[in-house]
Amino acid sequence: MNALTARPVPQPPALIAHADWSTNPKKRAIARALRMADGSYTALTPEPVSGLPDLFARLRAAAGAGGTALMGFDFPLGLPRAHAKAARIDRFVPTLRQLGRGSWKAFYDPAEDASQISVRRPFYPQRPGGTKRQHLIDALGLSGAQDLFRHCDRPTDLRGAASPLFWTLGAQQVGKAAISGWRDLIAPALRSDPSLRIWPFDGRLAEMLSQPGIVIAETYPSEFYGHLGLQIAVSNKSKLNPAHRRDDAGRLLDWAARNEIRLSGALTADIRDGFGTGPDGEDRFDATIGLFGMLNVVLGQRVQGEPADPVVRRIEGWILGL
């Protein structure tokens, strides 16, 4: 499904940014790297995402007049093909503009019980207690558990399977983050700015980065752990543990040096310190990992992951670098 050869993008973006997302605004962090006059990148320490209404305007300003920004988010962008077929959805992005409105008004409201689940209200459950993924499978008319997943959600040689989009319980669930990201940020931005582009739905990455504006991509920091050779990917390690984050400091600093990425003094200090012991440490860590993983792709150290399957390109979406 992927390109077999990694190569740098022909026109690297002026700005690369990655947001570690959460339903809690206080747990959202964004890391950025700016392209310098000599063509190298300088990476900055993560900051709070802050206000959503002007986020893309701030990215445009940082990229400069006529510049391009590549923005990564670690929530799903796309729908499982079985659900799309049942809901008669042919393209994800045009549908995303409509979700939460009209006949899709209840889309973002997680079903309180199995009887409320439908193709137009697929997120479940609203709260724990007597809930099963089988309820989703049955109510959506799916053939089995595999139909809850997009192809890019399936396990790879570097990680286990991602959580299915519509499931909203548990530490690994992504449903609530997708609701927040789509409803509160991406969909409103698409409705107000048709020039906003989402990879891979709106074209190949290299082609989109050759044009001014903002390109959005889905990322998965847990996948990037393996791309960057981090020990935190090992089963007995956790990003929640500051000591485990510190254990990978040397590997992150070495990766940046090998790829001629300049790090701000604050980012260097944060990496060495494992991003501190505060509750936002894991968020700032993953924001940085996401940024480095995106740089890895842009610089040609990792395949972009251009999917060949037309259903993936129209409906399911893909994870950058997979």
Regions found by a protein language model. Name each.
Residues N2-A17, W21-L322:
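RNase H-like (RuvC/DEDD) metal-dependent nuclease/polynucleotide-processing core
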